[in-house]
């Protein structure tokens, strides 16, 4: 039957990508339908019970800055919070949280059920409705046909999924859930380039069978250790609107290690390993290898650290992070019991590997819309990524762009200098994947600007402009932005000099007496000098006219005041580095945002090698920046392409343009670039 209601956006799949996609489209005012094979598993954490980490935490903060749900749900469900790389620079500091699976899923479900313009429907999708070269809806397993202007596919590991435990395997989307075999077959019929990837998960352990007295405790930040050692730092918060008061009871993680005996037992199972015997065809994640892969690749290491992570407050289940495996169950059990504290471990669920289909993200436009099928968007593991955070970011992005298309508006996009989400999208659509892609800070060229702490400053205004950000978040953002601006100006315009700050106080606070007059911002630039230090100096130098944390706390509240002070300290201390990176961004912008003509026939650019012409024709990059990141497209090839465009007299590519000159206005070029078909090459560049 044809369902009587037509939707603006249909989202297929209810994992981390699907839920963010559906919420984003609905927040933007589009009538949105979320189709899932099981409403009870919406927002389920299929693998590890954690959110965030290096690079990943940055994505979560960006999703939050754009109005997404992941950070807020983590604040409501997180049972341990830590700041990773806390001793390093602000660009690579990252928030990570252990989450209670049940609480996290409930937090996501609550948001989905109460979001205006969003409908939920429990049915697996078996087919897409395609008319000509455009998708117009989806068909469920019992033949219900839903029509929509756009469709977002977020199928995760379900497309023709197959679980492996030893040499035994069976069809599944994940443990306990059926695969999406019919939908996978339908996508292959549409001639969309695809491949196989694999990921895995470790066996789960009953905590009652673990001897924690033998293990090393790892408490979270902001929590006193079991021996009474006080917390050395405040408890982190994920959402810009969150607070530590939202966190449930906190729990520690525990550390054990594999040993030589563990490795010996694991090796005895290699002849029954689906990975080593060639049963698994898909490529696994490089940065989250199985334990058998680790001991095979790093044979010189006799031990690997294993983190025992609690699955929640109301369960005894533990997740042993570091021993993902697809070896036979008898090997899993024997190996686990060789580890300290795990001698009597009881396994609740076996570890397994799962193979699944993904579709080549190089066949997507910058908006994540398919180049082949109009209105069809892809997000999450179907694009070849791995990780909840990468999926959530893609889901929000694809959902927003599906909504914008349904509304008749231009797509949303982010540059590599604007967001980790921009880096993620650009990497996927220009480079593609040969293994599951995960985010790291090292993937971003401009990471000093792409910090966790300023994700809202970078993105919330953009999110507001397209309807992603509600009034509550917008008001909070403006309060923070105004406070940062106001306080920055006050620090720059408030001066102290030797006559009013005694030498003894100056030496105590700054290490030496002041030589001349300084404003507070200049003093804060010194190593080891904080906002509180200059505030104390001002209290002494100008009693009654002072800047202080207490003043900000009373004006803004403690959480917002702390965020404002963090922004002030980073912006002032790293101003020189940030300014230099801004110059790098401006230099790169000349090429990065310069759009290539849609009608450009690369086969006619005879100065280019056959390989380069072939790759440019295949991938059809939208900008010169994207073209530069395609494998095999060299700087020399770009120069030859520029010469061709100049000879063709495309707007912005005239004979007088100099490659090394200052940036040409990309906006001016892009206005008319596609209105000027190439002429015969008659003049010199």
UniProtKB/Swiss-Prot annotation:
Keyword line: Cytoplasm, FAD, Flavoprotein, NAD, tRNA processing
Cellular location(s): Cytoplasm
Binding residues annotated for NAD(+), in chain numbering: 284-298
Keyword flag tRNA processing: yes
One of the record's GO cellular component terms: cytosol
Principal subcellular localization: cytoplasm
The UniProt record lists the keyword Cytoplasm: yes
GO BP term (any one): tRNA wobble uridine modification
Chain residues that bind FAD: 13-18
A GO MF term: flavin adenine dinucleotide binding
Cofactor(s) annotated in UniProt: FAD
Function of the protein: NAD-binding protein involved in the addition of a carboxymethylaminomethyl (cmnm) group at the wobble position (U34) of certain tRNAs, forming tRNA-cmnm(5)s(2)U34.
Subunit text: Homodimer. Heterotetramer of two MnmE and two MnmG subunits.
Protein family per UniProt: Belongs to the MnmG family.
Protein name in the entry: tRNA uridine 5-carboxymethylaminomethyl modification enzyme MnmG
